[in-house]
Amino acid sequence: MIALLTGRLAHKSPDAIIIDVNGVGYRVQIPFSTYYELPEEGKTVSLSIHTHVKEDSISLFGFRTLAEKEFFQLLISVSGIGPKMARDILSNIQPEELAAAIVQGNLVRLSSIPGIGKKTAERLVLELKEKVRKMDVAPSAQEAPSSEAPAEVADDVASALVNLGYKEAVVRKVLAEMSIEPDASTEAVLRQALKVLMK
C-alpha cells in the first residue's frame, strides 16, 4: 500500500493533483484544505496517502498532515460514508472543528456539512465519539475564535484566488456577495469561494 508520496507537482486542481515520482504520474484526490497548502506546479510536494482498494480500481487520497489522514480513515469506518464523501467532509470543515462537533454531539453543526443528513450526523457521533476523544486532534470544550477580521480574510482569499488564475474582478464580486462571519478563517472562506467559482 502507498502511504506517502514525494515528487514533483505536475498538475493541481481543487479536488485532485498529479504527482510525478521518477517519471510516473500518480493521481491523488485531495480535500480543499490540502489544495490550499500546495506549492506551485513544478515544485516538490509530499503528501500522506490513503490507498483505497476496490475490486475494479485503486484510488489514492492525499493529505497535508498525518492527523488529517487519520481522521479521513475514521470517517470511512462509519457505515454509509465512502472515501469521496469523507474527502468532501474534510473539504468543508477542519478536523479540529469536526472533532469538537462529534465529541460535543453537535448534530446541528454536523448536519450543516454538505452531504451529511441528520441520520449520518447521528452515526458519526455514535460510532466516533469515543475514538475521537483518544486522538491528538480531539479539541478542548471550546474552540478559540479566529482573530482575523472579515476584511483581512477577504483580502487574503482574493490574493490566493488571483494566484490560482481567477480574475480579480470576478473574485471580488463573489466575495462581495458572500456572507463572511466575523470569526471565519481564511481557509473556510477560500473553500466557500472556490465552490461558487467552480459551479
From Swiss-Prot:
Family annotation (CDD domains): UBA_RuvA_C
Region annotation (Flexible linker) maps to 144-154
The UniProt entry, under SUPFAM superfamilies, shows: DNA helicase RuvA subunit, C-terminal domain, Nucleic acid-binding proteins, RuvA domain 2-like
- Major site of localization recorded for this protein: cytoplasm
What keywords sit in the KW lines? Cytoplasm, DNA damage, DNA recombination, DNA repair, DNA-binding
Q: Region Domain III: what ranges?
A: 154-199
Q: Can you supply a Gene Ontology BP term from the record? A: DNA repair
Q: Which GO terms describe its cellular component?
A: cytoplasm; Holliday junction helicase complex; Holliday junction resolvase complex
Region annotation Domain II: where it falls in the sequence: 65-143
Instruction: List every stretch annotated Domain I.
Output: 1-64
Q: Name one GO molecular function term.
A: ATP binding
Q: What remark about domains does the record contain?
A: Has three domains with a flexible linker between the domains II and III and assumes an 'L' shape. Domain III is highly mobile and contacts RuvB.
Full protein name: Holliday junction branch migration complex subunit RuvA
Source organism per entry reads Geobacter sulfurreducens (strain ATCC 51573 / DSM 12127 / PCA)
Q: What is the lineage of its organism?
A: Bacteria, Pseudomonadati, Thermodesulfobacteriota, Desulfuromonadia, Geobacterales
Q: Which gene encodes it?
A: ruvA
